[in-house]
Swiss-Prot record:
Entry GO CC: plasma membrane
Keyword Oxidoreductase: yes
Molecular functions (GO terms): protein-disulfide reductase activity
Name recorded for this polypeptide: Probable disulfide formation protein
One Pfam assignment: DsbB
Origin: domain of life: Bacteria
Disulfide topology: 36-39, 96-101
Membrane topology qualifier: Multi-pass membrane protein
Membership in a protein family: Belongs to the DsbB family. BdbC subfamily.
InterPro entries: DiS_bond_form_DsbB/BdbC (IPR003752), Disulphide_bond_form_BdbC (IPR012187), DsbB-like_sf (IPR023380)
UniProt KW keywords: Cell inner membrane, Cell membrane, Chaperone, Disulfide bond, Electron transport, Membrane, Oxidoreductase, Redox-active center, Transmembrane, Transmembrane helix, Transport
Annotated transmembrane regions: 7-26, 41-60, 67-84, 109-133
Length: 136
């Protein structure tokens, strides 16, 4: 199982990233839900990863983690910060625009958008790290 995951880590990372990109566009343009500022920052990290990981998967380039891991970790840090804004009372942020960064919007009825984002970025990061290992 681990060998299968290691051999296909880039593909799974790209699949998670592409799913997140499609879901983000679906929420914005089809459901007309305006994202907050922190969501835009997470998108800045997520959208390029779809292209970068897609090319790396096609070329079987495991060295892509040098470029993709910083984007993934940055997105995860922003998502965790937004989770803290939502869950810790008294935490505020001054950069929020018309949409509050602390507003909870649930995906599938039980997980918030930043929590789904943090999980996706965490999974992408783990898969990128795993893709470079050469253990037999």
């Amino acid at each position: 199982m681990i060998r299968f995951l290691r051999n296909n880590a880039l593909y799974f990372a790209w699949l998670i990233c592409s799913t997140g990109t499609v879901m983000s566009i679906y929420y914005s343009y089809l459901l007309n839900i305006e994202p907050c500022v922190l969501c835009y920052y997470q998108r800045i990290c997520l959208f390029p990863l779809s292209i970068i990981l897609g090319i790396a998967t096609y070329r079987e380039d495991n060295l892509v983690k040098i470029y993709a891991l910083p984007l993934s970790i940055t997105g995860m840090v922003i998502a965790v910060y937004q989770i803290c804004l939502q869950e810790i009372s008294g935490m505020t942020i001054d950069i929020c625009g018309r949409v509050s960064c602390s507003t909870k919007l649930f995906v599938f009825g039980f997980i918030t958008v930043p929590m789904a984002s943090a999980l996706a970025f965490c999974a992408i990061s783990c898969l990128l790290i795993l893709s470079g290992s050469k253990k037999k």
